[in-house]
Amino acid sequence: MRAPIVPASSSNLHSCGRRARLQTKMNDSLRTLTLLPLAAAVSSVFAAPADDAKWNTLETSVVSATGYEQDVRRAPASMSVTTAEELATKPVTDIGSAIGDVPGVDIGLTKMGNSTISIRGFDSDYTLIMVDGRRQNVSGAMMDNGFNPTSVFMPPPGMIERIEVLRGPASLVWGSDAVGGVVNVITKKHPNEFTGSFTIEGLFQEHDEWANRGGTSFYLGVPVVKDVVSLGLRGRYNAWGKTEVMTPAGKLATHSPTEGYNENVGARLTVTPDTANTWWLDGDFTRFKGGSMNTSNQSIQSRQWYHKYNVAAGHEGEYDFGRTESFVQWNRLDKVKGISTPNDPTKSSYSETHGTFNDPLASSENFELSAKLTTPLELGSLGSMVLTTGGDAIYETFVNNQSTASVIEGVRLDQTQLAAFAEGEWFMNDQWSATVGGRVMWSDIFGAHATPRAYLVWQPMQALSFKGGVAAGYKTPEVRKLVDGLYNSSKGTDYYGNPDLKPEESWSYELSSTAELGGVASVTVGGFFTQFKNMLDSEEIAESTYKAINHGRVESKGVEVLVKTRPVWNTRFTGGYTFTHAEITEGADEGKRPNELPRHTLTARVDWASGPFTAYVKSSSKFDMAVSNPGNKGSRNAPKYEDYTIVDIGGSWTPVKNHVIAWAVNNVLDKDTAVFEKSGTSSWANIYSNYIEGRNLWLSYTYSF
């Protein structure tokens, strides 16, 4: 473990430590690997041009903007795509780590080590996670104690075709959870030949306080009857050790995840009896264990076990009148075990609880029925239109059987939501298209509400496009937060509901332009503005006591810049800058920022490829992050967290066809983000918003066929 030291520039800042002595042979190897992509980049200048087939073209098709496939340049939304090739070059522990390079997206870490995904300045609660257009979000009530299940459960990377990220509201097609944006994982389907992949990987830390981890995954696509029946099988296993980040007081920091694992198996059966109809059945089961070595700064180790079930069946039709898509889905997340152990061996506050499938400690369950029809219409001299209509019904429940002395203990809370939507994308000519639509949602608690959307796209030439639009959003509170009394108590902190809570309402506006510069580069510049009414939050009404509230009004505005080039002498560049300013503009907290997300984010990545070799170097910088409650509950006294930049390098080698060896050195400059300062008389606070692992080496081997 690195010994704590005191930086020379400050008397009250302490680091998790830098070793004064020479590192082991492995550490020397890490430093040697640091130079590899730099040498590769230099040599690329003198290499022959890369085969464009190795790179994605500037034209990309997406489905998340409207529910049907179209060119991303004409899609009525701001979108980014992460490809399977990009996923293969970096460690992917969850969905957050898979899309961490996307501009406009901020990835945070909980104290259990899970990712949180925030888009355009709003918390992860406003981001809808989907797999093939099916929602994976569960009740926010399951996100207690730093566990965020929505980003943990994902298909094996070898099964993923691409991940689409829609920045901005998408409630019209996808529902109220998509107020901030959408992350849609698109998987491989219906193979007509035997295909698959197998991956084994490991991540090795340079410093002892961070945990090593390893895992394996596979995907098999089996054409049982060619072009008629296929079977897809998938599985994934990841395991990690415990992290032991220490404060100068000799105590474990709160963001020190315990050891854990993530296991997933699934299968998909697809039947295409004729060219017009496709039927499918998909099942998935995941087990997860995780926790914190010092939960809520209470010197207690907390470990939790979860089971997640997902079963869905659906139909896709291609007919003369249009395309139909429908499915029914059952999604359930159970907390099945919990263990709390005191870090102080003299104390006897050990506790262990168990649940079963029929009687879990806590459970979130939802049933969804969804149907959609996409119809192309010819309008003669007025152009053409694609009309999308549909609806969905969602019944969700939550029950907490844990002994929390709350008014909802053992009570099954439920909510039913029905929705219908219609949206028309009118292609007036080759240059202009307009999208207008609306969604009507009904809740058995809050009644009916309508959310409209309008979007305009102008593409005066092939290389230039302009987009702009306005959309409304609507989000109902968690049912448990509507109770009149205590709904949760955890490690000395109490949370009270509020029966007067109102649903959130929002209006979002955006304008952007994309230019392709001579077929060499693509540049997108855009701005956005979102105004919330009755934004849901909580306020501290007494020490360690919180109550659910509505803020009066909250605004988020910003600018996004994205740059992407084609290969030039084997090298290409992608990068982005995001400015986000979020502020409470009405109520008791007027003038404050609603969260700790960065105001400025800068990302840059350079890729190189030649023959069997690829290499990359990338950086991510975050600036101006506010502290929610300076000096309170272990947070730092200053109003802001420190800025930081993280640099990663990596690459791959394909020695023979179908065999790929990939590597990465993460945090290559070994930026130490576990640096502490005094907070109050007895506690310490990290001066950075996230605990980012020190320098580490990731190695991966993949066989595909």
Please report, for each region that a protein language model flagged, where it lies by residue.
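Gram-negative outer-membrane beta-barrel transporters
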Residues: 1-3, 199, 375, 427-433, ...
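N-terminal Sec signal peptide and the immediately downstream disordered periplasmic leader
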Residues: 2-92, 98-102, 216, 221-222, ...
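Acidic, small-polar-rich N-terminal luminal/periplasmic segments of exported/outer-membrane proteins
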Residues: 54-193, 511
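C-terminal beta-signal and adjacent terminal beta-strands/loops
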Residues: 139, 533, 623-630, 652-705
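Outer-membrane beta-barrel translocator/receptor signature
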Residues: 144-147, 158-161, 167, 172-184, ...
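Transmembrane beta-barrel wall of Gram-negative outer-membrane proteins
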Residues: 209-241, 245-289, 307-314, 319, ...
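Structural signature of Gram-negative outer-membrane beta-barrels, strongest in the C-terminal barrel
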Residues: 272-274, 384-388, 396, 406-531, ...
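Outer-membrane beta-barrel signature, preferentially recognizing the C-terminal barrel domain
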Residues: 298-318, 364, 413-415, 459, ...
